[in-house]
Amino acid sequence: MQVDLLSSAQSAHALHLFHQHSPLVHCMTNDVVQTFTANTLLALGASPAMVIETEEASHFAAIASALLINVGTLTQPRAQAMSAAVEQATRSQTPWTLDPVAVGALDYRRRFCVELLSHKPTAIRGNASEIMALAGVANGGRGVDTTDAAANAIPAAQTLARETGAIVVVTGEVDYVTDGRRTVGIHGGDPLMTKVVGTGCALSAVVAACCALPGDTLENIASACHWMKQAGERAVARSEGPGSFVPHFLDALWQLTQEVQA
């Protein structure tokens, strides 16, 4: 199985496009991570909007550059709003991304996410256990935590990509991005990133934004993984622990955008 690597030039080009286009991202995400997700998008130059009311969500999905569906704090009313937004995004050809949080551990959200797959997401981002569960390979995971290595989920991710037409992102010590034919691996990051709530969810929002960019969508999404890992490495070098990591991480994202504009 061939796994390609992303070049720094590809990553820099995608970040330049990101800053240039400043996607408006409709984030229907979980309650725990909304502020961090919004700040991550802002630091990179995107515009976040957290619209969750059913009538508003359906309308906003038509005008946003991209839509994120994150089921981390799923409720029945929220599921209805998400379904309405996805249906409108499909009609309006708005790219949308699914983050199937804890789908391997909880049956209600697994059924809901499987239903959403019929609307053909542009991208799917999850950890190894989530991707394997969504692909029907195995149930598992410890809530939002993975119990599988990312590399073990590559075959499931490739199958899921081929079946849905989505670009699938499996995150872990190494991130893997695949469209079912090409697979790109992104190294880097730091274990401390797993001790801060929302780094994966924020990545899903950046992935959603990248789906709205021109050019090679797989490379743009792989670049999103690279930016987050780069920023994580820089932040860890300046941090004393999870508490001081977050502001340094946001600063590092901002600095990355400034460097590609120089």
Curated annotation (Swiss-Prot):
Catalyzes the phosphorylation of the hydroxyl group of 4-methyl-5-beta-hydroxyethylthiazole (THZ). Belongs to the Thz kinase family. Substrate binds at residues 50, 198. The gene is thiM. It catalyses: 5-(2-hydroxyethyl)-4-methylthiazole + ATP = 4-methyl-5-(2-phosphooxyethyl)-thiazole + ADP + H(+). This is Hydroxyethylthiazole kinase. The lineage of its organism: Bacteria, Pseudomonadati, Pseudomonadota, Gammaproteobacteria, Enterobacterales. Its EC number is 2.7.1.50. NCBIfam families: PRK09355.1, thiM. ATP binds at residues 125, 171. The keyword Lipoprotein does not apply.
